[in-house]
Amino acid sequence: MDTPKVLTRDEAIKIVREYKKIISPRFNGKAKVLMYGSYSKGNANPWSDSDVAVVVPKIDEDKWLETSVALGNDSDKVSLLIEPVLMSEEHWSPLYDDVMQTGIMV
């Protein structure tokens, strides 16, 4: 079995930009899209995925699951490597802090 090719950071960002174009209308352009994880930190390997945070100002809890599933379906239209995570600015988490500190705004 051949080892998969490691994307460059620029190649990963290009893929995430395509994804952002697809999802932006869902949030009326108000979502921040950040690439975080191995590609943003510069330590991606052949099995790395593109961790993508979709940060919205606010989302109703009853819409959270539905929106997360839709984001996953949208990511499959661009690349199976994209792993989206929905986040809200009003609900703090340690992951949110990490994304904001190390993520690359796309």
What is each PLM-predicted segment?
Residues 52-54:
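Short beta-strand->loop micro-motif that forms the acidic, two-metal-ion catalytic signature
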Residues 1-32, 41-47, 57-106:
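Catalytic core of pol beta-like nucleotidyltransferases
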